Regions:
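Bacterial Sec-dependent N-terminal signal peptides
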Residues: 1, 9, 19-54
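Extended, subdomain-level signal for the structured scaffold at the beginning of enzyme domains
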Residues: 52-175, 190-208, 213-225, 229, ...
Length: 404
């Protein structure tokens, strides 16, 4: 319907009604009728405006079809990433559809059902139905969507970059104004083979994704079977690959592209999609792992001191994922390559979590690292503590002898 002409026609009807009732000015119901007509006249523009603006923005979430046996036989999509992104979109009133190269039911890698965002997703029957009945990408009409969000997981490396229908969807969104093309973790692999006018669409685009270091640390099971290295391939296609330290939050917005580096970048990348679509973002409570990663990031960037971090944990440790923070300290030490600054930061993280989380192997590593950074006093203290608890006693005693 032509909204402007509808308004004009209704206005003419209203004028005729007003003229008719002007003649009946002495009628006792005139004043009531006049008020009613005036209210209707004022309401018409509001009704017409609301008809134009009630349609929801729509986002197509895409997951890999490659997974089998919860990732045991073949890697699939990351359930954590799907959960976080879906919940952000739903909370911000976006209409969500889910597609995969083959369509139908899709298999995620193994995941932790106790995480709050996964619990919420598993309680959402609509979301579960979408995952059981994904749309085949060949059946998707790109014109129906304002945004696409490619979920990561190692399975994305095996099928998404080679799906011509998915490439067509991305190209149509690429060539349409006011659209968003987003992905997280291994999801940006989909961009590796998408061209427009013989040029890769990510040429001169700043983006991020799962880095070479993250693959080395966390992707050993499948990385040798990958068709390409994600970081290297995107760089070779002309993209400006951006990254932060391993498994910290990093989101890059470049034109209509929104990308997240790893699973801990998921919620923020989904929120960037919402904002890039021009919508007002709904406030939400951070998840414990998300809050923990942000605290780690602040410690490493030295925007938060260790003393301040201790105070934060003392105030309410339940708001943080302590094992995650401790394990991050372990990996920080592991990849430090004897760089003193990185070794110190790693020990600080392990120290920070020690009152709440104890692991003898981690404590032994901490003691050995103290030796490397010339803090023999603390190394001795940790080694003696292990001996007193009869944990890794031989290794701890050897360390004490080496210190002397």
């Amino acid at each position: 319907l032509n909204k402007k002409s509808d308004y004009s026609i209704l206005n003419e009807v209203t004028k005729r009604d007003l003229s008719r009732h002007f003649i009946l000015a002495n009628d006792k119901n005139y004043k009531k009728m006049k008020k009613l007509i005036l209210n209707i006249t004022l309401l018409i523009p509001v009704l017409l405006f609301s008809q134009i603006n009630t349609s929801k923005k729509k986002v197509l979430m895409v997951v890999s079809s490659y997974g089998k046996d919860m990732g045991a036989s073949r890697p699939g999509y990351e359930f954590d990433e799907f959960s976080q992104a879906y919940l952000v979109f739903k909370a911000n009133n976006l209409k969500v559809d889910v597609a995969s190269p083959k369509g139908g039911k899709v298999e995620p890698d193994q995941y932790n059902k106790d995480k709050l965002y996964n619990q919420k997703l598993l309680e959402d029957q609509e979301a579960l139905n979408l995952l059981k009945n994904t749309k085949p990408t060949a059946s998707v009409n790109a014109e129906d969507y304002d945004a696409i969000y490619i979920v990561g997981g190692k399975g994305a490396m095996f099928d998404l970059p080679f799906d011509p229908s998915l490439q067509d969807i991305i190209l149509k969104l690429y060539n349409r104004e006011n659209t968003v093309i987003a992905s997280v973790c291994h999801g940006p692999a989909v961009f590796a083979n998408v061209k427009y006018n013989d040029k890769y669409i990510i040429k001169d685009i700043a983006l991020t994704g799962f880095t070479n270091m993250e693959e080395e640390l966390f992707g050993k099971k499948w990385v040798k079977e990958f068709p390409f290295s994600l970081e290297d391939q995107l760089t070779s296609r002309g993209a400006f690959f951006k990254q932060t330290d391993f498994m910290l939050s990093k989101v890059v917005v470049s034109g209509k592209f929104v990308t997240g580096q790893n699973p801990f970048s998921t919620a923020k990348s989904a929120e960037e999609v919402v904002q890039t679509l021009g919508l007002q973002l709904v406030n939400r409570e951070l998840y414990t792992d998300e809050r923990s990663v942000l605290l780690i990031q602040d410690i490493l960037d030295e925007t938060t001191t260790i003393d301040d971090a201790k105070a934060v944990l003392n105030k309410d440790v339940s708001q943080y994922d302590i094992p995650l923070m401790a394990i991050y300290g372990y990996y920080k030490i592991l990849v430090a390559n004897d760089k003193r600054k990185d070794l110190v930061k790693g020990t600080e993280l392990v120290e920070l979590t020690s009152p709440y989380f104890f692991n003898e192997d981690l404590q032994l590593l901490l003691a050995k690292t103290y030796v490397k950074i010339d803090n023999k006093e603390k190394a001795t203290q940790v080694a003696k503590d292990l001996i007193s608890k009869n944990l890794l006693k031989e290794e701890a005693e050897k360390l004490l002898r080496d210190i002397k």
